[in-house]
């Protein structure tokens, strides 16, 4: 009851995030379609080959950036989930833990999609930057999940 206003705000934020994640499904599909379309570009001449290659590279960069944003958003949601677990109804704390595990899975799944796209990019600086961010985001997400689960498991000990 003491944190009811905050929980109402968090519920609104969660609904907005749900809508964002649904929009990201479409963005990811569009990014894949764009890469696929680039592979269908003509490649009969050297100029066509160069244009096709450049288009594939740009489309693949975008295809890596879409799931990276999903991973960032899912990680931010983990902070919200932590607040809910700590301040919300104690009878629902295990639900918050399941939400945390799901958010961590969303982070890691999105990062796998980032990495598969990075593997075919020639822009090594771009690849290194996103790979470093992906590694850090994975570390942070796993640590945040562990922090909450350890905390709640300790509380639940009989």
Predicted region positions:
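Conserved, well-structured ligand/cofactor-binding cores
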Residues: 1-158
């Amino acid at each position: 009851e003491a944190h009811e206003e905050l929980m109402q705000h968090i519920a609104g934020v969660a609904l907005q995030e749900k809508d964002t994640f649904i929009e990201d499904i479409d963005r990811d599909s569009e990014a894949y379609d764009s890469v696929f379309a680039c592979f269908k570009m003509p490649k009969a001449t050297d100029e066509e080959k160069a244009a096709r290659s450049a288009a594939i590279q740009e489309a693949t960069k975008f295809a890596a950036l879409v799931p990276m944003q999903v991973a960032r958003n899912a990680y931010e949601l983990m902070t919200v989930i932590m607040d809910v677990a700590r301040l919300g109804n104690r009878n629902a704390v295990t639900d918050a833990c399941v939400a945390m595990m799901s958010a961590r899975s969303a982070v890691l799944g999105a990062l796998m999609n980032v990495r598969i796209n990075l593997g075919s990019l020639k822009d090594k600086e771009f690849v290194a930057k996103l790979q470093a961010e992906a590694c850090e985001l994975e570390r942070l997400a796993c640590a945040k999940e562990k922090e909450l689960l350890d905390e709640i498991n300790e509380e639940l000990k009989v």
